[in-house]
Amino acid sequence: MEYVVFDLEFNQGFDKTLNKTVSNERCPFEIIQIGAIKLDSHFNIIDTFNSYVKPQLYKSIHPFVGKMTGIKSEDVMDAPSFPQVYKEFKKFVSTKKNTVLCVWGTGDLKELFRNITYYDLPYKT
């Protein structure tokens, strides 16, 4: 058995002219980074995954997101798209059939599924 512990960072829209948060109701939070570690059955780290994601919906980093994460627009501007990073993340996760996904809280799972759905990507392995 393997465990994959992952964490997502996501961005949201911000209108500088109006100085307020704006969002796309289909995808209010856009994933801009996926980080993960893979553990064996004895909880030893056996692999890591980390990738920024180039924003397609909210191209500028929301001021609050930047303050909380330290991520700047320059960090993500040349990153691969979400579909590309998601494909690589699925490969990272899917090395064994009995892999357990672990995450801090339910927010990351909800937003991962919402981003997958927004881009119409397959979520079953």
Residue positions per predicted region:
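Conserved non-catalytic scaffold segment of RNase H-like nuclease domains
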Residues: 2-109
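Substrate-recognition/cap helix-loop segment adjacent to the acidic, metal-dependent catalytic center
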Residues: 107-125
